Every structure is written in C-alpha cells, then in structure tokens.
From Swiss-Prot:
Binding site residues for ATP: 34-41
Pathway named in the protein's UniProt entry: Sulfur metabolism; hydrogen sulfide biosynthesis; sulfite from sulfate: step 2/3
Organism field: Staphylococcus epidermidis (strain ATCC 12228 / FDA PCI 1200)
Family that this chain belongs to: Belongs to the APS kinase family.
Phylogenetic placement of the source organism: Bacteria, Bacillati, Bacillota, Bacilli, Bacillales
Listed name of the protein: Adenylyl-sulfate kinase
Amino acid sequence: MSESNHITWHDSEVTKKQRQHKNGHKSAVIWFTGLSGSGKSTVSVALEKELFNEGKQTYRLDGDNVRHGLNKNLGFSPEDRSENIRRIGEVAKLMVDAGALTVTAFISPYKEDREGVRALLEDNEFIEVYTKCSVEECEKRDPKGLYKKARSGEIPEFTGISAPYQAPENPEITIDTEHDTIEQSVEQIIRYLKEHEYI
C-alpha cells in the first residue's frame, strides 16, 4: 500500500457529536459476524428497517453488495478477505463520523480483522453481534447453494468447510439464530442499544 507525505487530513466544521445531537442518538457500528447462512443478512436487514422506522439515521453494508463495487477486485484468499474487512472498517468509520448507526453483515472470519476494525473506532462505537448457528444448520439452510458447491470442491477456501472461522470470544451480543426468530433477534439487539443508551 503506497503512502504519500503530501496528503493532509481536512477536518469538518461539523463534529460527530453535533451530528449525533441532531439525530437524537449515538452512532456506532453494529457488526454482524457468522458463518454463511447463519442469518447475518436476514437479521441485519430487519434491524435496519426497525431502526429506520424508529426515526434513526441508519445504513447497512452487506458482504455480497460491497463486492459488486467497492471490493469487486478482491477474491477470497486470506489476504483478500482481510483487505475486504479493512476497507469496510474504514467506510463504517466514516459513517459513524457522519452520525449513523451503521449495520454491517460480513462473515469476517478472522478475529484479528474484526479487532482491527474495533481499533479504528472510539470506545463503545463497535458492537460485535455474533450470529451463532451451527455449520450443520447453515448447511441445511444453504440459501445460495454455496455449501453444496464447497462440498463438491467447486468453491475452495469456503468458511466453515475448507477455511477457518474464528468465533468471537466476548462479543457484545450473541444472537442464537438456530433457535430464535428474526423478530426475537432484532428485539434483543434493540434492547441492548436502549440499555446502553445508543438510542
């Protein structure tokens, strides 16, 4: 990654605190992590809608969606996966600075990468949501047919099958998508946000 000594950071005259005050809530990254098929996208879509309906400034970044544009030049090697998360972390930080409750849904299999995003943000601005679901259940669901392709060898380095997933050890929130409904999971997250005075 090239760096230049000729680049200067320009501060805005509108602060993050001012934006949060105008929005009537704090800003943070609500970072969903979990296996493919665990329900990250499904629950994050429902959460974004609930926050929006409650009048909150919110935006969702989805793993598949960003690979159509921002990260379309990245593959799925360990290095590219890490770069994928690094870029998303930087975008999420900008959105937090803009005062938004930023919902992200990425497998983000490596603990080091997730902690790297946490380190970009101020204290309490990174809310890790572990979307807990067994490989067996994820494979049973297989909404995109990816597990079938991974088992046949069509997709190498597939998280949970032929590539590792490092589950969070101390996430702020764990949702049990194998047993709880979408509504229950969203309710659990909203409750956390209210109890910790984000909203």
